[in-house]
Regions:
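Solvent-exposed, acidic/polar segments of extracytosolic/periplasmic ligand-binding ectodomains
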Residues: 300, 372-434
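Short beta-strand elements in bilobed, periplasmic/extracellular small-molecule ligand-binding domains
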Residues: 85-103, 167, 219-232
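C-terminal segment of N-terminal export signals and the immediately downstream linker at the start
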Residues: 14, 35-55
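Extracytoplasmic ligand/sensor domains, especially the bilobed periplasmic-binding protein
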Residues: 70, 108, 123-228, 277-304
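Extracellular/periplasmic periplasmic-binding protein-like sensory domains
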Residues: 165, 269-346, 410-433
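Extracytoplasmic "Venus flytrap"
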Residues: 52-73, 101-107, 130-131, 200-209, ...
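Signal peptide-proximal N-terminal region
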Residues: 71-98, 192
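N-terminal secretory signal peptides
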Residues: 1-19, 23
Length: 434
């Protein structure tokens, strides 16, 4: 049975932004001592620094967490090469260790494991990445228990829905950056389309934020937006959406779904004879594994935001090598294609090392103050936090094409906001039909 646009799937409920954050904040609350948030006791004296790492090793976001633990271990080896980080208050260098725990790509589980890292493991610092599904509940726990937290790979506005923040700091792109990158690609072929955009924006923090901000900006730029409404994550029947897009003559499609959900939608588009001239996404088609999983040639010509690549002209503050060298090292060690989260996971350790050196202490307030004062050039670009606790990192546009070394390779086709990141190919238009 097909689903009407915005209809709830039986057995699943549409979660509001308030419900999402409430669920994330109170996950694992039974572990709390008393009903009021309060600082966690200092860790027992130990001869190392401990960083907590909630990570989606499994579940729908597992492709985002795939570079771990390889990249974590590489960064730690560089940090600990000469004995670790000199902590002035300890009067000596301390090695850095991490505790990596699977969140199963679930916000409640993320809140639970984060609270355990704080209350049971007494981590000195938290690092969390990979969409607001991970970042928001982990940040909520760090705020609750006053633990400094470095966040990345979570679009800023979606992350800010869980604020205001005192202890958590995010470096990543903002939604206006991705909107402008997408519009730049669409404007380049605007004379060959009806400028009618269909949105696949689910009922989660990303979907709600993107629907609001994309719609406003696209209408300002003369685009018609066909929004079928919010729908539950996990939706697998898109017949009613496709019928609406056909009726409204949608020729550009955009999505911010988890990869398995978009894969279902995109396959059904082809099965039901709806092939837009362009399809541009973020989260669902970031990963090589996600586009390959579409099957056949369904990835050919898909356009996507690119927040990190071998072509980004930035270097590691830990070891001095560039983005391409990190990608090459990953491929040589694992035999797998580079992915965008690889650089951002690495960069969180660049920030952590810099912060701990400047703090000279494991006092959590001093670590928090050091995060706030960060001004560092990293492998993903410069990071300097503003008063809202975030730092913007560069964003360009890319396109998946048939590759020489890999089944699908990502080319840079748009760089209007960041011309220092060079284009590697021209935009293929329209999407090739099978």
């Amino acid at each position: 049975m097909s689903m009407k646009p915005g209809e709830k799937v039986k057995g699943k409920s549409s979660m509001t932004r308030r419900d999402f954050m409430k669920k994330a904040t109170y996950a694992g609350a039974a572990l709390a001592v008393g009903s009021m948030a309060r600082p966690v006791r200092a860790a027992e004296k130990r001869d190392y620094i401990l960083i907590g790492r909630p990570n989606p090793n499994s579940g729908p976001l597992s492709a985002f967490g795939e570079p771990s633990p390889w990249v974590d271990e590489r960064a730690l080896a560089e940090i600990n090469k000469d004995g670790g980080i000199f902590i002035k208050e300890a009067g000596k260098k301390l090695p850095v260790r991490i505790k990596l725990v699977d969140t199963e790509s679930d916000p409640s589980k993320t809140g639970d494991v984060t609270s355990k890292l704080i209350l049971q493991d007494n981590v000195d610092l938290m690092i969390v990445l990979h969409t607001p599904i991970s970042a928001n509940p982990a940040s909520a726990m760090c705020e609750r228990y006053q633990v400094p937290c470095i966040v990345s790979d979570a679009p800023v506005e979606s992350w800010l829905t869980g604020g205001p923040y005192k202890w958590s700091y995010n470096f990543f792109f903002t939604v206006p950056q991705i909107v402008e990158s997408f519009i730049s690609m669409w404007d380049s072929i605007a004379d060959k389309t009806d400028k009618t955009v269909g949105g696949l924006w689910p009922n989660d923090p990303d979907g709600k934020t993107y629907a609001e901000m994309f719609t406003k900006r696209l209408q300002e730029k003369g685009y018609k937006v066909v929004d079928a409404g919010r729908f539950p994550t996990g939706t697998m029947d898109y017949t009613s959406f496709i019928n609406l897009w056909k009726k409204e003559k949608v020729d550009i499609l955009t999505s911010i779904q988890p990869p398995p959900d978009f894969a279902a939608a995109w396959r059904q588009c082809f099965q039901q004879g709806f092939i837009p001239k362009m399809s541009t996404g973020g989260k669902p088609i970031i990963m090589p594994s996600a586009v390959q999983a579409l099957g056949g040639d369904l990835a050919n010509g898909l356009t996507v935001c690119v927040w990190w690549s071998p072509y980004h002209p930035f270097k590691s503050s830990l070891a001095g090598y560039n983005a391409k060298a990190l990608c090459d090292a990953w491929t040589e060690k694992t035999g797998r294609q580079w992915t965008q989260p690889l650089g951002f996971i690495y960069a969180t350790y660049e920030v952590a090392a810099d912060v701990l050196k400047r703090a000279g202490s494991l006092n959590k307030e001093k670590i928090r103050e050091a995060i706030e004062q960060t001004n560092l050039n990293t492998i993903v670009g410069p990071i300097k936090y503003n008063q809202e606790h975030f730092a913007r990192t560069p964003m360009v546009g890319g396109q998946w094409v048939k590759g020489k070394k890999w089944p699908w390779e990502l080319e840079i086709v748009e760089n209007n906001q960041y011309p220092e990141i060079k284009k590697t190919a021209n935009l293929i238009f329209p999407i090739p039909k099978p």
